[in-house]
């Protein structure tokens, strides 16, 4: 199937007011349905595709998929349709090799031959270098570079499909992703959540250092995936080591997320920021990053829309 951006019915236009609006999207696997619920309401409030109102979009893992599609001009309903079609197939696969193949097929089918030269806004896709244990952030414009501008290549010369797959490669549940840069360097990558499951700090670094925006002229919207009870393991999952590994991965990513947000609050308290990622404690909300039940995923999306409602007035002040 060929995917393309449909003509938009969202026609509101905004003038340039010198405010740098930043959208940062957390990782969290299938729980990205919550993110889509929040973004659907933001898009409807704005009356225009998100790329037309935000200057920068950064994403990690599931947030990287959404960020890349936003930057290519997709509207939220189109992204939701893609998630509904593909996420259950990827997450229901029974092995790392099968999940990796399903993720690779998804990335190639959706992004095709798109490169970082095709994006319509500033973008950052966060992955983690396996060997050197450092972040690798794929960007589209040399103005976002913090150095080595003379050799800058959009997205390091890597396709969007490969960059997004790397950002989503939650090892050991997915295999590591090997990419080859425009310089001919072979790099082995894993999920960006291992270094910045919440990519807000990297986005603020671009806005303040690379783009040289004053703190007072920046507005940050950081959308998480929500916090949920752990699902009760079935008999087979109790026996298998997989259940403990899922718990450990989720805990690692959540600690990373909260640490990055706390650090952001300390270092950049003067930059107006709204974080949306509510906690849901009812037992029926139990889920994890490998969820593939569409009824449960639709419930997460509904919760995301409700989370928007609790902050609508502040979001309107930031964005309109």
UniProtKB/Swiss-Prot annotation:
Residues 23-204 form the PNPLA domain. GO terms for cellular component: membrane. The gene is capE. GO terms for biological process: defense response to virus; fatty acid metabolic process; lipid catabolic process. It comes from Escherichia coli. Belongs to the patatin family. CDD domains: Pat17_PNPLA8_PNPLA9_like. The keyword Lipid metabolism applies. PANTHER family: CALCIUM-INDEPENDENT PHOSPHOLIPASE A2-GAMMA. This is a complex CBASS locus with the loci capE-cdnE-probable diadenylate cyclase-capV-dcnV1-cap2-cap3. A motif (DGA/G) lies at residues 191-193. It comes from the Bacteria. The active site is at 61 (nucleophile), 191 (proton acceptor). It catalyses: a 1,2-diacyl-sn-glycero-3-phosphocholine + H2O = a 2-acyl-sn-glycero-3-phosphocholine + a fatty acid + H(+). The lineage of its organism: Bacteria, Pseudomonadati, Pseudomonadota, Gammaproteobacteria, Enterobacterales. A motif (GXSXG) lies at residues 59-63. Its EC number is 3.1.1.32. A motif (GXGXXG) lies at residues 27-32. Pfam families: Patatin (PF01734). Phospholipase activity is specifically activated upon 3',3'-cUAMP binding. Is not activated by the other cyclic dinucleotides 3',3'-cGAMP, 3',3'-c-diAMP and 3',3'-c-diGMP. Therefore, is specifically activated by only the nucleotide synthesized from its adjacently encoded nucleotidyltransferase (CdnE). This is cUMP-AMP-activated phospholipase. Effector phospholipase of a CBASS antivirus system. CBASS (cyclic oligonucleotide-based antiphage signaling system) provides immunity against bacteriophage. The CD-NTase protein synthesizes cyclic nucleotides in response to infection; these serve as specific second messenger signals. The signals activate a diverse range of effectors, leading to bacterial cell death and thus abortive phage infection. A type II-A(UA) CBASS system. InterPro entries: Acyl_Trfase/lysoPLipase (IPR016035), PNPLA_dom (IPR002641).
